[in-house]
């Protein structure tokens, strides 16, 4: 094989001989073997210097540019690649069979054609079918053309013009400092009324709320360098507004005592007053009832004067506020027979009389204090077995015989018990128990 490459100033020339052309055929091999193929090009020295050399599989060498010379194989491939490149377009097909690119505007030629057809009096639905463009796109283009006189598409993406300029933020800060309770929509109206913004660039209510929250909200809390410029805060305790009851302080005229630590001044203007009441962030003793009762000594109001802060002293409280109903009411409730089974002795009542509050003592009409079974004198129902003591009367008919005497005795005993005042609630409970059964029961007061 013979390969020659000649380069000129403005032209290049490639010539070669195919030694293996005889394999294709004797006639073609002789014709191709005797002659030489020349390919010339007038591309200039730059193309000659950047000439690509391609070695074929048969051992031959080729030096052909992409756009040069008659190469059957390469030209055919290029001709086939052209339609394929045209077919590989990016887009989708709509319901009318037209091709569109999602997110991109319609070409200006189609836009102009839509406007021209509309000026000829063709309906938008007919334009949509003829140009294979969706009806919404046609209507939108025509509406914009009638409003602005332009067929150009709007801006894709981008951002709106900035409305929260430093001047607007400054005015919003001034409005908020002048009136801390102002609303965002009121600030928007004042921006329009003062001429700071017009109706096109006025910020929305949400934007004003965001400015108040992010930019101006941080300015409300002074920094460390601004603390010296501001006047000292008022000596108001933060928990006075949380708790509605009076807080004992050294400056209060009531004269209540308050524990002060040594070395701490007790002046009213000093902020670091020792807190004997739990603060707003305290978790321990959150109700503070015991602390408050120990400090004040009694409950506030007219009711508190009658009670002592200690529960042990409540046994001597007057029971005039708790009226007792007649004991005959106990005989009128036969439905509570199930509760009568549980007996309770008088000694247990006298034992607990020293530390129970006055309202916890049972009245004379309660049935839980009976120590004898009540089936004999309460209702003519089925007889109950004796629990601890023998029945007062025989079962069954005993109710009819002794019912009147029992009621009269109980009424007399109850009237006698209400005439005199017992010295203590424990004694009253014992007396009521004795008046019910008509038997003297000794009670020990401890």
Swiss-Prot record:
Xref: SUPFAM superfamilies: Homeodomain-like
Annotated region (PAI subdomain), positions in chain: 92-148
InterPro entries per UniProt: Homeodomain-like_sf (IPR009057), PAIRED_DNA-bd_dom (IPR043182), Paired_dom (IPR001523), PAX_fam (IPR043565), WH-like_DNA-bd_sf (IPR036388)
Localization (cell): Nucleus
DNA-binding residue intervals: 89-215
SMART domains per record: PAX
Keyword Glycoprotein: no
Any one GO MF annotation of this record: DNA-binding transcription activator activity, RNA polymerase II-specific
UniProt GO cellular component terms: nucleus; transcription regulator complex
RED subdomain as annotated region, ranges: 167-215
Region (Disordered): 414-446
One Gene Ontology term from the biological process aspect of the record: bone morphogenesis
Highest taxon of the lineage: Eukaryota
Keywords in alphabetical order: Activator, Developmental protein, Disease variant, DNA-binding, Nucleus, Paired box, Transcription, Transcription regulation
Disease link: Undulated (un) homozygous mice exhibits vertebral malformations along the entire rostro-caudal axis. This is due to a single mutation in the paired box region.
UniProt function note: This protein is a transcriptional activator. It may play a role in the formation of segmented structures of the embryo. May play an important role in the normal development of the vertebral column.
Name the record gives this protein: Paired box protein Pax-1
